[in-house]
Amino acid sequence: MAKGRVAERSQTEMLHSTPAGDRAVGTQGSAAPGNKDHLKEKPCVEAGSARTSLLILVSIFSCAAFVMFLVYKNFPQLSEEERVNMKVPRDMDDAKALGKVLSKYKDTFYVQVLVAYFATYIFLQTFAIPGSIFLSILSGFLYPFPLALFLVCLCSGLGASFCYMLSYLVGRPVVYKYLTEKAVKWSQQVERHREHLINYIIFLRITPFLPNWFINITSPVINVPLKVFFIGTFLGVAPPSFVAIKAGTTLYQLTTAGEAVSWNSVFILMILALLSILPAIFQKKLKQKFE
């Protein structure tokens, strides 16, 4: 019992003393020489204050919102009714109304519609704003399946990576203050799967064990490399996106987002989640056998 408390205390101290900057972002190897010492010499600068972080976050959000405004302004001239429907969908009715507008202009203004979809999806993912599930369903309605799947996976990977970098830049004070205990527990899991981190990230993206927003903001704090994070996310969101996109082909027959998921699709997702983690399990067993 005492050993367990000591181990947990050690993990907590490590979480505060060795943020993601201790490793080269996007690599899985050791940190660059001198980088670790430099961070330890300036803990206050590394952690930052919650107020400063909030100001930076608001500034970044304002800039991103302005970019979204420019994207919207570059859209073709819309009628009053169409402008009302040009919003982030919150339910299936909103998604249907938005799909109707976008499908009308998709062929004539293909690039503008694609850019608007791309930018909106990444914006929602970056700032952990709900609504991306409806955009995933909408992609199946607007585009051919291969393009829709690639688009959703790319947007999810980029958006989650931007959220990762945002957390790396300004989110650590929030993690330290409000999510330390949960982050420590996940850090222990990450260390156990360090050799198969991509498989583990894929597994987490397929399954609902950890919320996506939690994975995004804590990953840089517990030394998940950005490259591994992006690849794991890009591949991991493919199976659930497959289900959502397939449902989008029958958009106007759906009344809720829950109808996009059947028991059959849940079973398939469970099988894929198991397959994603099997290489790590088998290699661990073989390693134990030969040792």
From Swiss-Prot:
TM region positions: 52-72, 109-129, 147-169, 197-217, 225-245, 262-282
Keywords recorded for this protein, A-Z: Autophagy, Endoplasmic reticulum, Lipid transport, Membrane, Neurogenesis, Phosphoprotein, Transmembrane, Transmembrane helix, Transport
Sequence segments annotated as region (VTT domain): 140-251
GO biological process: autophagosome assembly; intracellular lipid transport; modulation by host of viral RNA genome replication; nervous system development
InterPro entries xref list: TM41A/B, VTT_dom
Membrane topology (UniProt): Multi-pass membrane protein
GO molecular function, one term: phospholipid scramblase activity
Basic and acidic residues: bias regions: 1-11
Catalytic function, reaction form: a 1,2-diacyl-sn-glycero-3-phospho-L-serine(in) = a 1,2-diacyl-sn-glycero-3-phospho-L-serine(out); cholesterol(in) = cholesterol(out); a 1,2-diacyl-sn-glycero-3-phosphocholine(in) = a 1,2-diacyl-sn-glycero-3-phosphocholine(out); a 1,2-diacyl-sn-glycero-3-phosphoethanolamine(in) = a 1,2-diacyl-sn-glycero-3-phosphoethanolamine(out)
Location in the cell: Endoplasmic reticulum membrane; Endomembrane system
A Pfam family of this chain: VTT_dom
Phosphothreonine found at: 18
Predominant subcellular localization, coarse grouping: endoplasmic reticulum
GO cellular component: a single term: mitochondria-associated endoplasmic reticulum membrane contact site
Keyword set includes Transport: yes
Annotated stretches, region: Disordered: 1-38
Domain of life of the native organism: Eukaryota
Role description: Phospholipid scramblase involved in lipid homeostasis and membrane dynamics processes. Has phospholipid scramblase activity toward cholesterol and phosphatidylserine, as well as phosphatidylethanolamine and phosphatidylcholine. Required for autophagosome formation: participates in early stages of autophagosome biogenesis at the endoplasmic reticulum (ER) membrane by reequilibrating the leaflets of the ER as lipids are extracted by ATG2 (ATG2A or ATG2B) to mediate autophagosome assembly.
Domain comment, as recorded: The VTT domain was previously called the SNARE-assoc domain. As there is no evidence that this domain associates with SNARE proteins, it was renamed as VMP1, TMEM41, and TVP38 (VTT) domain.
Quaternary structure (record): Interacts with VMP1. Interacts with COPA, COPB1, VDAC1 and ERLIN2. Interacts with ATG2A. Interacts with SURF4.
Family: Belongs to the TMEM41 family.
Name of the protein this chain belongs to: Transmembrane protein 41B
Originating species: Rattus norvegicus
Gene: Tmem41b
